[in-house]
């Protein structure tokens, strides 16, 4: 009511913008256009058109960075800095997360791309701080609901992997090098553009049950080894009805067919900038 009164007293205000909402305000008496923003996934307001803005992708990073560098250097810089401000300063981590959330994120950073269970995380965390399994569960759900992490489900078993929405956050949480899984997270971040749910199994890093396309992160695998791997995963691709398998690499490129399945080998920069 106070907001409505304020707007009635200040008729020069033509648009109301409310940022970083964590609750739904009373907007019934407001008669001007309204823009609301939130980082909470399940905060929905009836009568509003919804637009989801993700962290920037590689193409946007190139535009924002304005650095005249070779494309491979830009990929390396993107891997290092990440997709948002979280990749810039450690102080933002302390300001944005509770101690429990930080400990969970540190564990996820150390185990990026690995199969993870809440029980496993809880057993590890209770060695360092006083907490409960329910608290860990709620904290993980909050991190997922605020676009910090992304849970990738196995296509058949009750297994999951957890990645970062901004892979640059991993670099601020963990000093150990894990280029293979960081590149995997990088590939996944580009797939977010499709607004589809992805799954994994032991054959494919990510695949869509809707588009029937599978993706395999292979940053340093050479073409001969990729072709050997393609032969091994071919039966599973045919079983799942997948007729397009994409290997994302740092620089290798090729195309070939096996029993009607297209295997495409493409560098990350062309994969990302080709959307």
Where do the protein language model's features map onto the residues?
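Interdomain motor-coupling "hinge/lid" segment immediately C-terminal to the ATP-binding subdomain
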Residues: 30-33, 37-115, 119
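Structural motif
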Residues: 7-8, 141, 237-238
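Accessory nucleic acid-recognition modules appended to NTPase machines
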Residues: 89-212
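Conserved strand-to-helix beginnings and helix N-cap segments that scaffold or border functional pockets
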Residues: 27, 133, 226-230
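Conserved P-loop NTPase "ATPase switch" module shared by AAA+ and STAND
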Residues: 5-27
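A cross-kingdom feature that marks ATP-driven nucleic-acid transaction machinery
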Residues: 1, 11, 154, 159-275
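A structural signal for isolated positions on well-ordered beta-strands in alpha/beta enzyme cores
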Residues: 16-17, 33-35, 244-247
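Short, polar loop motifs at secondary-structure junctions
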Residues: 20-24, 36-43, 203-205, 249-255
């Amino acid at each position: 009511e106070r907001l409505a009164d304020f707007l009635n007293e200040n008729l020069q205000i033509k648009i109301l913008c409310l940022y970083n909402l964590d609750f739904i305000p009373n907007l019934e008496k407001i008669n001007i256009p309204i823009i609301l923003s939130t980082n909470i996934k399940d905060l929905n307001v009836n009568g509003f058109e919804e637009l989801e803005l993700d962290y920037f992708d590689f193409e946007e990073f190139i535009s924002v960075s304005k650095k005249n560098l070779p494309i491979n250097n830009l990929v390396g810089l993107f891997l290092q800095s990440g997709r948002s401000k979280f990749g810039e300063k450690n102080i933002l981590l302390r300001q944005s997360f509770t101690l429990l959330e930080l400990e969970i994120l540190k564990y996820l950073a150390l185990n990026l791309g690995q199969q993870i269970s809440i029980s496993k995380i809880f057993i590890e965390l209770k060695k360092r701080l006083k907490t409960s399994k329910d608290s860990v569960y709620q904290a993980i759900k909050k991190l997922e609901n605020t676009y910090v992490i992304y849970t990738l489900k196995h296509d058949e078993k009750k297994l999951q992997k957890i990645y970062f929405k901004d892979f640059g956050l991993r670099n601020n949480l963990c000093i150990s090098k894990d280029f293979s899984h960081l590149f995997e997270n990088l590939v996944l971040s580009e797939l977010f553009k499709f607004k589809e749910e992805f799954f994994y199994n032991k054959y494919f890093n990510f695949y869509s049950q809707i588009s029937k396309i599978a993706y395999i992160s292979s940053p340093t695998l050479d073409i001969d080894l990729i072709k050997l791997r393609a032969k091994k995963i071919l039966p599973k691709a045919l079983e799942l009805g997948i007729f397009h398998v994409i290997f994302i690499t740092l620089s290798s490129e090729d195309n070939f067919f096996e029993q009607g399945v297209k295997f495409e080998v493409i560098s990350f920069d062309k994969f990302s900038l080709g959307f």
